Curated annotation (Swiss-Prot):
Lineage, top ranks: Eukaryota, Viridiplantae, Chlorophyta, core chlorophytes, Chlorophyceae
Species of provenance: Chlamydomonas reinhardtii
Biased amino acid composition, Acidic residues: 123-135
Compositional bias ranges of the Low complexity kind: 136-150
Region ranges (Disordered): 1-34, 115-151, 255-297
UniProt biased composition (Basic and acidic residues): 259-269
Protein name: Ezy-1 protein
Amino acid sequence: MAAVVGTGSDGGGDESGDRRTADAADADGDGDGGERAWLRFKADVRACLADLRNRKGGITLHRAIVKDMVSASSNPGARRSSSSVVKMAREELDRLMPFLLDDFLDNMPGLKAAFTGKAEPGAEGDDGEDEEEGEAQGVGKDAVDSSSSSSGGGGVLSCTAWQQVLGRTVPAVSPTLALVLACGYLAMAPRQYRALALVPMILPGKTGGGVDGALTREGLSLLKKLRPGISGLADKDKQWLEWVIARLAAEFAVQPAGDGHEPEPKRPELPPTAVQREPPAEEQHKPTAGARDSPNM
């Protein structure tokens, strides 16, 4: 599917293009929920990238994402060396990003199928095998829930399919872009998946921004909340830690309470002294209120 990509005054992609196409399909009654969800997802990812570029220090992540996509792209027009990306001015990065992103999303194995539930054109093997494989991986016809969407129509990914979308981004050589894809999904997520709103907290804060160096204090705090007993972090780089947070946040969203209701508060554990306390001897032999009222007494 060719996406509508343009360059605005800031050099970013026209993230409203796909959304306008999806809205037109809604108005005409054309297209299915999965196709509309796919177009909206692409538009939301572009919007997330545009927002990222405008943040303080966002150029560092912006450059890292371009470098990741250049490495993953098989398109001859996208061939660049990592060293040339490092030296690129912001204007050149802005011009290259929309082209790379469109190519990257369209060619990431199984990504579009996770939204549409359909075998992708040109996929290897016959249609029957593709359909079986898609359904076995949780990206078949049940992957998209068309009953609700905060975007106003269209489908939303099931949590199982969403975790697979996030998981495919690392083999595609872009753990950094995985975080942006996570943010792009938020605009479409039904309210029971609101725990995924934790993911934007992974992106650089005021302390320790960028893709290199130590994890931000906010990110480290979030990681420990999601997995209290986690250890062995000293030898891990920041991208690995950010990826772990993204996965844990997605897992948190699919815990049993993710049915649209607030989770039942956990009962506090009594301290050992309270648990082991014996009642006074005179209280042990007192009849209960029910026993006193019994006709047999």
